[in-house]
From Swiss-Prot:
It comes from Vibrio harveyi. LuxC is the fatty acid reductase enzyme responsible for synthesis of the aldehyde substrate for the luminescent reaction catalyzed by luciferase. GO terms for molecular function: acyl-CoA dehydrogenase activity; long-chain-fatty-acyl-CoA reductase activity. Its EC number is 1.2.1.50. It catalyses: a long-chain fatty aldehyde + NADP(+) + CoA = a long-chain fatty acyl-CoA + NADPH + H(+). Disulfide bonds: none annotated. This is Long-chain acyl-protein thioester reductase.
Length: 477
């Protein structure tokens, strides 16, 4: 089986018929057209979205989202088929991914709130706002490169939407492990209106990291901001080849875990933990890989967790695993058993629970494997937090998180959520300890003239006169 994905350059669909890159998914193949110097020139010379106001942008995204909301939308149906056929997603998981794309695009209020909380105002990109002794306005950085990872398809959607919400041109490098999501999103914009400035502002490309990346490096040298997702090698490549004067937003590998503090409702606690383990099969930075349990219902909780992991295998089945992934999963089980750890696993390798002392962890194969650690008190967890490495801590009960959030945050945790909510990034929250939209705009200040008196100095700022009369200190508050 073979699928062809054409280039998208400034919203134009281009098939080159030559120099196509090939990505293999076992016996299935995806062929993607390569870009050349002409395409590079076209992208570099393209305008941004300066003439669009925020209402125009969000209304267009909403219109696109309404298409994704329809289960009869051909682009959505093709996308779901690709996730199942090529990436091994279960039908339920693939459908959920498409549903989330619809949800994100259609959530107009959330999009406005994201701009408001991250940039300070929904109007700051459309007009000059008085702030202190200045007028301030946010302008797009310009050309933004989005180097996507394939472990979490929605991260690519999020990255592109951040670029659009800040009125930037988006040049997207698809991931070899998911060449479908960014491409389908861009094509859905074209479906709505091929001549819309948003459609024309997006390019979707691909190049293998192992190939000659000279042209890709040249393209990167023209960027005004780079958003890099993925492993350390991908992040290092982006930093190495980006211009030294621009921002590189780095979303690298992170680890997350769950803290259970004397849970009273074991049914609810186990449901939340199972969700945080099973969503994306632990391939996301926010996925729970370890559970720290404080309380006297430890054995009962484990039984409930087994029940909920089996439930999730029905409602959100695990994606198809490669031979290597299956082998690593089995080897981890054998290694832990040989080391004397207690292992609870499912005959078909659909999930695995490993019990160990806090801090004891062998290989982690992901794929719905979780280490469970019995602790005396929640304060003991602080020592296992690694600054710049620990992203999300899921708490149950949520009220317990208020007691420990200061200590956990001071140690380096970047995000604290209720158990069962790790995949939902609330509007207003930070992402990897930053406000990404702030780094995708240029804040320009138009400062008041000399005769504008300040709160501290109630006279006109006549600096030449101050020097002539040597009266500077008179005006120091």
């Amino acid at each position: 089986m073979e699928k062809h994905l054409p280039l998208i350059v400034n919203g134009q669909i281009i098939s080159t018929e030559e120099n196509r890159f090939e990505i293999s998914f076992e016996e299935k193949k995806v062929k993607i057209d390569s870009f050349n110097n002409l395409h590079l020139t076209q992208m570099v010379n393209h305008d941004y979205l300066n003439d669009l106001n925020i209402n125009n942008i969000i209304n267009f995204l909403y219109t696109t989202g309404q298409r994704w909301k329809s289960e009869e939308y051909s682009r959505r149906r093709a996308y779901i088929r690709s996730l199942i056929t090529y990436l091994g997603y279960s039908p339920q998981m693939a459908k959920l991914e498409a549903n989330w794309i619809a949800m994100i695009l259609c959530s107009k209020s959330a999009l406005y709130d994201i701009i408001d909380t991250e940039l300070g105002s929904t109007h700051i990109q459309d007009e000059w706002l008085p702030q202190g002794e200045c007028y301030v306005r946010a302008f797009p950085k310009g050309r933004t490169m989005h180097l996507l990872a394939g472990n979490v398809p929605l991260s690519g959607v999020t990255s592109i939407l951040r670029g659009i919400l800040t009125r930037n041109q988006c040049i997207v490098r698809m991931s070899a492990s998911d060449p479908f999501t960014a491409h389908a999103l861009a094509m859905s914009f074209i479906d709505v209106d091929p001549n819309h400035p948003i459609s024309r502002s997006i390019s979707v490309l691909y190049w293998p990291h192992a190939s000659d990346t000279t042209l890709a490096e040249e393209l990167l040298s023209h960027m005004d901001a780079v958003v890099a997702w993925g492993g350390r090698d991908a992040i290092d490549w982006a930093v190495k080849h980006s211009p030294s004067h621009i921002d590189v937003l780095k979303f690298g590998p992170k680890k997350s875990f769950t803290v259970l503090d004397h849970p009273a409702d074991l049914e609810e606690a186990a449901s939340g933990v199972a969700h945080d383990i099973c969503f994306y099969d632990q391939n996301a930075c926010f996925s729970t890989q370890n559970i720290y349990f404080s309380g006297d219902k430890y054995e009962e909780f484990k039984l409930k967790l087994v029940e909920k992991l089996n439930l999730y295998q029905e409602v959100l089945p695990k994606s198809k695993q490669s031979f290597d992934d299956e082998a690593l999963f089995s080897m981890t089980r054998l290694e832990c058993q040989f080391s004397g750890l207690k292992v609870i696993s499912e005959p078909e390798n659909n999930w695995m629970i490993i019990e160990s002392e806090p801090g004891v962890e062998y290989n982690h194969p992901l794929s719905r494997c979780v280490y469970v650690h019995k602790i005396n008190k929640v304060d003991d967890v602080v020592q296992y937090i690694e600054k710049h490495q620990t992203q999300t801590i899921s708490f149950y009960p949520w009220e317990s998180s208020k007691k420990y959030r200061d200590a956990f945050a001071a140690k380096g945790v970047e995000r604290i959520v209720e158990s069962g909510m790790n995949n939902i990034f609330r509007a207003g929250g930070a992402h990897d300890a930053m406000r990404p939209l702030q780094r995708l705009v240029r804040f320009v200040s138009h400062e008041r003239p000399y005769n504008f008196t300040t709160k501290d100095v109630s006279v006109e700022i006549e600096q030449t006169r101050f020097l002539e009369e040597d009266k500077f200190l008179v005006f120091v508050p």
